[in-house]
Amino acid sequence: MELNSIKPAEGSKHAKRRVGRGIGSGLGKTAGRGHKGQKSRSGGYHKVGFEGGQMPLQRRLPKRGFKSHLLKFNAEVTLSALEQLGLAEVDLAALKQAGLVGEIAKVVKIIKSGEISKAVKLNGIGATAGAKAAIEAAGGSIA
């Protein structure tokens, strides 16, 4: 067997139905589109979500909530990322310099994801309850 001689099994593929090619084909004249209407015309169809002029569902439903603009100033750092950093004292500037948080970050919180074995002192950085316990268990502190 050669790659260029592989063929699908006999009868597994069907030829595409040719429409609009005479009455004897069973799909002549209107070509399975029925009579008149927007869907029978060439190039004629509505956009997704259009309900014929009726107020569409996404506009009938009320708006909910908002997206906080403060989120872009908040950042999270995992315990495993803190472990790889290898610093004894960590503050916002050190995290920015290491590239763990963005330049516009103003608030950083350490979250408990991964393990930490080195003692780390955090200055001006928050931590979740689980992360705080893990840091203190490793001999670190949070100031």
Curated annotation (Swiss-Prot):
UniProt keyword terms in alphabetical order: Ribonucleoprotein, Ribosomal protein, RNA-binding, rRNA-binding
Return the SUPFAM superfamilies for the record: Ribosomal proteins L15p and L18e (SSF52080)
GO terms classed as biological process: translation
Gly residues composition-biased segments: 21-31
Pfam name, any one: Ribosomal_L27A
- List the GO terms this entry assigns under cellular component, sorted alphabetically: cytosolic large ribosomal subunit
Q: Does the keyword Protein biosynthesis apply?
A: no
Q: Name one GO molecular function term.
A: rRNA binding
Q: What InterPro entries does its record include?
A: Ribosomal_uL15, Ribosomal_uL15/eL18, Ribosomal_uL15/eL18_sf, Ribosomal_uL15_bac-type
- Chain spans, region Disordered: 1-56
Asked whether the UniProt record includes Ribosomal protein among its keywords, one would answer: yes
Q: Which domain of life is it from?
A: Bacteria
Oligomer and partners: Part of the 50S ribosomal subunit.
Family recorded in the similarity comment: Belongs to the universal ribosomal protein uL15 family.
Function noted in UniProt: Binds to the 23S rRNA.
Q: Which NCBIfam families match?
A: rplO_bact
Q: Protein name, please?
A: Large ribosomal subunit protein uL15
What is the protein's species of origin? Delftia acidovorans (strain DSM 14801 / SPH-1)
